[in-house]
Curated annotation (Swiss-Prot):
Gene3D superfamilies: Nucleic acid-binding proteins
Gene Ontology cellular-component annotations: small ribosomal subunit
Stretches assigned to coiled coil: none
GO BP terms in the entry: translation
Alphabetized InterPro entries for the sequence: NA-bd_OB-fold (IPR012340), Ribosomal_uS12 (IPR006032), Ribosomal_uS12_bac (IPR005679)
One example GO MF annotation: tRNA binding
Top-level taxon of the source organism: Bacteria
Protein name from the UniProt record: Small ribosomal subunit protein uS12
Subunit structure, as described in the record: Part of the 30S ribosomal subunit. Contacts proteins S8 and S17. May interact with IF1 in the 30S initiation complex.
Family the entry assigns: Belongs to the universal ribosomal protein uS12 family.
3-methylthioaspartic acid modifications at: D89
Keyword RNA-binding: yes
Cross-referenced Pfam families: Ribosom_S12_S23
Length: 123
C-alpha cells in the first residue's frame, strides 16, 4: 500500500480496457478487400473446415473474417463488408463478413433467418 506522499508524486492510473474489435475503430462496419480465402480447423472438441478470409481494411488493418452460411463466392480481390463478432472455436477470428453486401452473395435456398445471410424472400 503506497503512502500519501507516494500517491501525490505518482497518482494511480486507470487501466485501459481492451477493445474487442479494434480494427473497426468505433464504426459498425468496415469495407475491405480479400487478400486470401481459405479454410481452417476449429479448436479441440469441434471438427470442421471453417471458411475464413484475410481482409485488408480501408483503414489499413489486416484482419481475419469468418464467412457464415453454406457456400460462398469469395475469392482474392473480392470487396467485402466486415462487422464485429468473434467465432468462439477459431482463435484469432474476431470479425464476420456480411453476406449479400458488395461482392458477397447471399446464401442460396435460405428460408429462415434470411436477413442474417443476405437471402432474398422466396417467391
Amino acid at each position: 500500500m503506497p503512502t500519501i506522499n507516494q500517491l501525490i508524486a505518482k497518482p494511480r492510473v486507470l487501466q485501459k480496457s481492451r477493445k474487442k474489435v479494434p480494427a473497426l475503430q468505433q464504426s459498425p462496419q468496415k469495407r475491405g478487400v480479400c487478400t486470401r480465402v481459405y479454410t481452417t480447423t476449429p479448436k479441440k472438441p469441434n471438427s470442421a473446415l471453417r471458411k475464413v478470409a484475410k481482409v485488408r481494411l480501408t483503414n489499413g488493418f489486416e484482419v481475419i473474417g469468418y464467412i457464415p452460411g453454406e457456400g460462398h463466392n469469395l475469392q482474392e480481390h473480392s470487396v467485402v463488408m466486415i462487422r464485429g463478432g468473434r467465432v468462439k472455436d477459431l482463435p484469432g477470428v474476431r470479425y464476420h463478413i456480411l453476406r449479400g453486401v458488395l461482392d458477397t452473395q447471399g446464401v442460396k435456398n435460405r428460408k429462415q433467418r434470411r436477413s442474417k445471410y443476405g437471402a432474398k424472400r422466396p417467391k
